[in-house]
Amino acid sequence: MASSLAAQLSQIAAKSTNQLDLKAQRIAHSQSLIFDRKVASIQDFDTVYQICYEGFQELCQLDSRFTAFERTIFSEQSKAEDRTQLTAAQNKELDVALEAFLALVGGRLLLNPAIKAVEWLVRRFRIHEYNTSFTILTFLPYYTTPLFLNLLAILPEDLTPTFKVLIPYKKSSINPPRHPLVHSATTNKPFLAALNSYVLQVSRQQAHHHALLAFWAGVYTEAVAGMLDASRSGRREIEKQKHEDIVISVLPILNDGFAMKNVSELIIGCYMVSVVLAQKASLQDKVLDSLMEAVAGSWTEETVESGLVCLAVLAQQKPETKLPRRALKAILRLDDIFKRLTELATQYKTSHLLLGVVAGCLDDLPRQKDTARLDLLSQIFQNQLLGEPEMSKAMALVLEATSSVHKDGAMSLDAQARLADLVQVFSQSESLRPTFQKTIAESSFDIAALEHNLQTVIDTAPAPRTVEDVEMEDVEKEEEQDHFSSTVESLSGEKLFKGSFLSTQSIPLFEKLAQAFTLAIGSKEKCQTFSDLAALGKNEAEKSPQYLSFFIRVFSGPYSMGTRVTALNMITSFLTSTESTNLDFQALLPFLLVTLTDPSERVRREAAAALAAVGSLYKKNRKGEDIWARDNLYGQPKDIKWLPTRDAQKVFERAVLPSLEECIFDATHIGKVLENTLRGVSVDANASELKKPLRLAFFTFLCSHAIELPLFTPKLGLLNILNRIDKAGGTTRTKELEPLLKTWRGFSEREVQDICEKERVPVSDVERQMVAIVTPKEKDSIMILLSNVSSHSESLRPSFIAAVFGRIKDIWARVAEDRQTVAAEQLFDISLGLSDLPLVNNSRDLLRSVQLPGSVLAQFLERIPVSLTDMEALGPAPKRRRTSQNNMIAMTVKDEAEFGKVMEKMTFILELVDSSSPETHPELADGLFQTLAALHHFKSQIQSGMSYLLSLTLGSLLAIVNRSKESAKAQFDTSVIRADLVVDCVRTTESPQVQNAALLLVAGLSVIAPELVLHSVMPIFTFMGSSVLRKDDDYSVSVIDQTIDQVVPALIQSLRDQKRDVVSGTSELLLSFTAAFEHIPSHRRLRLFHALITKLGTQDFLFAVLAMLANRYAMDKDVLVLMTGLVSDASAPVELTTYSKFLGLVSDSLKPKPGISQVLLGIGSDDGREPQKVAVDLLRDLAYLFKHSSLKVKMAKTFASEDEEAIRQLRSTFSQILEQVLTIGDSVQSMKLVSQANGDVLAALFGTLTLVDFLDTIEVLLERPNDELRRKVLRLLEGRLRQNPERDSASQIRVLDFLPTLVDIIRNSTDILLKHAAVACIDRIAEKYGKKDPSRVIGAAQVVASEACIGQTDDRIRIMGVLCLASMAETLGQVMIPALPEALSRSLALLELSLEEGKENSRLHDAVFSLFSALFVHIPYMISGPHLDKILLLSFKSANAEECEDDSRQEALKMMARKVDMAATLGAVDRNWQYAVQAGPVATKETLEVVSLAVEKHPKSATGKNIGVLSSILFKAFDLRREQLALGANATFDAADVDETEDALNDVTIKMIYKLNDTTFRPIFTKMLDWATSGLPKKDTQGSLARLTAFYKFLQVFFGTLQSIVTGYASYIIESVVSVLGKASPADKSTKALWLATMRLLRNAFEHDQDEFWQSPSHLNQISTPLINQLAHATNSSTAATVIAEAVPAITELAVAADSTDNHKELNTALMKFLRPSAGPNGKPAGGENPHTRLAALKAEQSLTEQLGEEWLALLPEMLPYISELMEDEDENVEREVRKWVKQIENVLGEKLDDMLT
């Protein structure tokens, strides 16, 4: 304790800065860089400052940046600074200044002024103590100088671990050598991190210097190299992980370094580190690409040479030659690039870099604007910068680019000429020709296609010489032979490959074999040697896929033409030589069909030969259906839709073989053949048509291969063929191949690149073919494509998105217009997203590039007013003609970002319209005028000209109008024209373009619609309607007010003086105002119209204004709001009078010769609307006014007043209105829409009444003879009661008083629909008011249950009545009992009727069961046993009725099980069980569900009381299996049904057991055992087996569920189980189920033994031997699998339960019998004679070893002899498994068994 305290005190003392410690202060003051300690100790700060300040001033003269420190650390005040007295914040601020100075002075430390200046920092601010790290790093580049020794001398003794490398040299006072510093950087992470951080900080401060950066670059490069070398490990995974950790730590430093382009030496240092990383670490392509882009992006003129060297080194490490795009662009932008590359190539390895440049020069040839890249390409080849192998690759790149250039677009003539010249150089140059000819020979380029693309002739390699000519090549051939021999020898040890070579993309063995096969090309002997390799399994080729799948992969893969031809030849040879004529080789068909599209004729010829060989095999095949490689062609079994052999033969003989000759000469012919074949058209004269089912099968066969094929080269070829076929045999390409598209979509960019790189297929080709899966003939083709990108856009590859949109563009024109509309809407919504997303840009580009239908453009235009409405509260009403536009209130758009989005959206829409030839879409006129109105309105709000948008809008309108002028009649509805807006555009805009467009548009409009532009018959109101009314400035408002006040009264008076009808006389005036409605600012509309009507006279004119507005705008929301406001201002009598006149106008409009309606509404005029449509609009608006005006409130107030006259007048007018409505209803019964609208008015009119008044009115109306009216009013009553009717006492009493009226209708009416309506009303009344006085409702219930209602023959009244009774049962409860007898009997009869065959009625069925459910819930005690029996019998019948839904029946049965007394429920089930079984599985399972619920939901006591009937049901159910077997072919249950039923039964039984105690259940169990074992005569073997199976399946659940609680019950069944084990067998179909049940029940019984039951010898001895003897059943692969799966786990669990060495030994002894062949007592083979038996025994030993471990291996000595024998077993499977067992034993014991086994 004391020593610890002393140590702590000494540490505190060492760090103390107590000012009283004078000795410590003197020592600290004497620390100096330039003075001796003694001299320094006697100097004061004034002296030191004077000396140091001189040095500082000299520094300032050298670099003006130092002057900034004159005011801080070199100020006069600094002499008094004491760091010990400063706060932490002040010290931190001081540290910033000190470090900035040190960074700046670091490059001049060898100068005396700099040392003097730093001396001040040491003496005054003690930087060596407080800023130790920064100080050391500043001096470190000078580690070899005396100056660094001086620094070491004054550094603190306790240096941090970061700088521990300096401690020995500080103590020894010597300069550190370089090696320790590099070693420290390599091994001491903090030191390296500090150095890197310091260098980056100094560089950012622009204080870098040569000494520092040279030191850092050397140390850091060596450190990184050292770290990578030190991380090398024998285990590749560990080494890779360590390398990744180092790379992750280095990359951020490089990233920061590359960002400082102007620090050249830092950049070069980063290049050095990058080179080390590339050479010593296995960097991924992605990392290399990023480094190369960073290097190329960082160089300047000073660093470009070093950067190119770095790029060359990095490129050499890349497996592929392609350079990153940014790096390539940076290279190509360099001046004198060829000169630079030439100089680079003379000093460094540049082959990959140059190949990358070559590939880059060839990239995207059609889009190259000039030939600069091709010029560079020519220079590279002509100066032969590449070696021969790389030259060949470069030539191949040129040829490949030239071959595929036509796919990407046309090449410019200059580019074509340059490439042609270059290829001519290849073929004519003496030095390049051999390489070029070799390249041609080893590749599969189509020379004819090359010549066509380049428009030149290519001299290919000469024909190979004969063997006699080749004498000088013997040595080379021998070397090749040696290479082949060594390769084959290395492969000779390979065992047969497990599976198919087509199973996955990456198979190392395949690569080795392919290399060997390539070496064998050209030599039959070598090919024969190669084909005999064990890994290929030629001898097993007919049974296993290895041999043929290898050659399939070769000829389908990216190999040279010769290699592929030889592979095809090997397959053909095999097919022609095979002796098995019953094999079906249809698996070859997809690959060979793809090969027929190969550009090489040689390849196609060999493919045709192979197909012919397959065809000949089909002819020999007489009976075989054995498809080669059916389950393992692609590894694990795949969902391949194989063709039946005869169908495959038909495909060959009718479609493929007749066209082979043409396919050889034409690579495209096979595509045409398949297309026509699958369409059902014969393309060849010798071919015959395939029937539709076969076409479908063939098509799905090919599609399934395309989906499941793991290799993308043949997959791409197959897609290329399939994508020609839209439909086949009733299915579509999209439907079949869409899973492939979804799978491809899910790949990441890296995965796609890896896939395509491995198989050398262009990513773009795969992307294009994948999206081409979607055919335009698919109904939702575009939406399918969009669904693949829209919801996953952030995670998808840009290339996939581009391909999808490219496909949409390709198929757009072939898609139906309605589908284009839906797609365009979605594309537009996508295009409004963030503009930098690929999905958004692609959507916009697509919309701009396709032909959009007019309907789509119209919908887009509709969005503009809506968008502007969202931006500000004063939005224009869409789709309405305006007549004025001013008087807007200025507003400010607060959200500028939102405004920008709206502007962008509008601009995009209008640009789309403008670019879509608007003159061809006259229907856009309406939307464009709306847009013009919205823009003009919004323009005034934001005080902006919006000239561009106006110009676009006017331009589109002008195009439409000009096109319309050319025809006799306008091509669009001229009523949408807004000439006032166009004029205002001229008046208000400052843009000449807009003005000119507007003037031209006005001129055009005057031609096609002069009445809208020129003066009308009432100039003043025309002017107001088209101009003034829409203004919103004060002056315009004043004009309107004065006009109304002065002109209108005079006009009215004039009409009266002339004795003209004032309403008809002012129709033009009213029309002007109503026409101007939508142009009037919304906040002024009500005030303006109210003033107008007031001046005209409300009682005389209100109806007319309302009618004209309704006629013109129908149900426009804004108009309805105005109309409601106008009528709400009127009194109740005036409002009712207005409605009466309004209805009179409706009646007039429907007359043959209309009167006033012709004047006001234009009825009967040439341009007037149809009277019925006018009537519908007027009636709908009137219904709205009744519902939403304040009439009801005003009438209530009048009725509540004491003004009798007013009340009388009101009732009179209301009655008149009602009479008018009824009269109209009578007259328009034949006019459906008018009648419906009139009915709405009637309903709304009644809605103005209280419920009491409503019922009073209905009673009167029900006395009318019109049944339609009576039905109508009852439906209105039901609707009102369905909502929230009045609940006051008076209303309730009145409603209940109304019940007798409804009952009377049900009893006496013959109109079924009227009865239906009455029952519906009773239903509502009973639900809403029944509980108020149930006794008044019961009478109605009895009538509904009687003959008069549900006793009718009409199903509608029956269903309504039954549902009404169900509602009443829920509401009335036991009060319902008087109606119950008749209700039950009739409903059961109805249910039975609804289930009659041919007369099924699901609605009636469901209604009756709903009634039963209600009765079971609310009065279950009233349902008697016979009723329950009847319900169950009918439910059984319902279960089998296909037309009936299950839900209602099942719900009723559940309610019965839950609510009805358990004894009654179980009794009914027991009585009717046999009928349930007769009905079938569904009824039986539902019956068991009833029992299950009854047991579950009732208490234990109820279960105990009813155990007798419950047992009876269970025994009957357990006997189901036996009964069904006895029925034989007449059985109603199949095996699966029986199993499912028994599962449900076992569940019920377990639930019952949970409710019983052991005393109650044990007798039942013994009874069950007796029932199962001895309950049948011995002769009934089949029945006994069935009962045992059912019982044992129950025991399996019994022991598995109740576990250790019931282990003791096993004593009852041991004898029976042993007996069963002696006679049941998994190989015997009749006993297999029993055997499986036995194994599983034993396993469960053993597994849960916690009472040592099975340890008892009496129990163990009985069961062990019979159980282990089950291994003898393993006599073939099928039974062995069953035994291993079922018996082995049971044996294992028995051993675990036995849990004693003696027991284990006994078990093992019995088990080992089966490990070796032996003879039984009767001389017959026994034990392990069969290898499958031995295998099963081995599996048991493995399981026991795994489960018991060392406990079981205590028996190892007696096992060893068996193991030794088994390791030499003649059966491979046994031998393999015993070796697994040996490894397992060795893992458990931790030692080898080799010594024990020898």
UniProtKB/Swiss-Prot annotation:
Keywords for the protein's UniProt record, in alphabetical order: Membrane, Nucleus, Repeat, Ribonucleoprotein, Ribosome biogenesis, rRNA processing, Transmembrane, Transmembrane helix
GO terms, molecular function: snoRNA binding
TM region(s), chain numbering: 942-962, 998-1018
Residue ranges of HEAT repeats: 583-620, 1042-1079, 1249-1286, 1293-1331, 1754-1791
Pfam families attached to this UniProt entry: BP28CT, HEAT, HEAT_HEATR1, U3snoRNP10
The organism's taxonomic lineage, starting at the top: Eukaryota, Fungi, Dikarya, Ascomycota, Pezizomycotina
Function field: Involved in nucleolar processing of pre-18S ribosomal RNA. Involved in ribosome biosynthesis.
Organism: Aspergillus fumigatus (strain ATCC MYA-4609 / CBS 101355 / FGSC A1100 / Af293) (Neosartorya fumigata)
Segment forming the signal sequence: none
Protein name: U3 small nucleolar RNA-associated protein 10
One GO CC term on file: small-subunit processome
Membrane-topology descriptor: Multi-pass membrane protein
Localization of this protein: Nucleus, Nucleolus; Membrane
BP-aspect Gene Ontology terms: maturation of SSU-rRNA from tricistronic rRNA transcript (SSU-rRNA, 5.8S rRNA, LSU-rRNA); positive regulation of transcription by RNA polymerase I
Gene this protein is translated from: utp10
Family per similarity comment: Belongs to the HEATR1/UTP10 family.
Superkingdom as given in the UniProt entry: Eukaryota
